[in-house]
């Protein structure tokens, strides 16, 4: 029974203590945005743009916040590069960077499982690459030993393997990915004023969900509550070969972060036609939509359609004579072979006749 509960804690995001959404009349718009992206992803580009446009007309601040929330969610799922074994080059080399290491369920005796050790190895390698960055380990008690937390065991492992204790930050309360995002944001913004950028480390199948929820928490707090923006600037994973988390887990976590109602069995909302704006929408949603949606292509006007046959007559297509020429040559060869020919006379000298009569 304990093992089952631990597994559920890792898979299902638990309710977290987050402030009310504060969206008021705009709350249904937020629910719609999450449902549209959950069920249609990039194909909902126009509809998502239209909903955020309506929100900005009612409340420019909230509309802009949701525009960024949806942009980042789309980017993380469609364009974000996932790095193996170590964080990428080019991240800040000072203490504005915090490396966030996602926890993983402990064994019943409180010891670290192999997958968590793999995550810590990626974290240690990345911490060596960025020697001035903070390292935040996050995770609560998931074993059977009271007081033994994922964060505590992760910190002990990093210290044992050479990382300075002064660089390690521990978040010991979270029992789900959603709680990780909420509690880490609160801890960093309240107690570590130098931090403005984060890089997330987890397993391959878990990195998309982790990044999506951390970005959503930061965008929501900065856009709605006037909080500090923690920019997601990188990631690194340990390879497990496991399939990615479902998009439904991301949608559920985002709903919890913003205190919005969520039902995973909700019927998919239908897409509706939206008049294309004069200027293209910036972001992954628009980029993918332009590639996949026929109505993003420029449609000819009625005058252009009526003038099209005349234009075709004025500029006829260039004919190719390669095939008729080849066919003619083939026919000539066949005729040359089949038509009977007269024997050709040879011009040779007359040889003297030999006399074979024996005298």
Task: Label every PLM stretch briefly.
Residues 1-5:
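Sec-dependent signal peptide recognition
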Residues 6-14:
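Hydrophobic core
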Residues 13-19, 340-342:
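Membrane-interface motif at the C-terminal end of an N-terminal transmembrane signal
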Residues 18-258, 303-309:
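A structural signal for short, hydrophobic/glycine-enriched beta-strand patches
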Residues 312-328:
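Juxtamembrane/start-of-transmembrane alpha-helix segments at the extracytoplasmic/lumenal side
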Residues 331-343:
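Alpha-helical transmembrane segments
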Residues 344-359:
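Cytoplasmic C-terminal tails of single-pass
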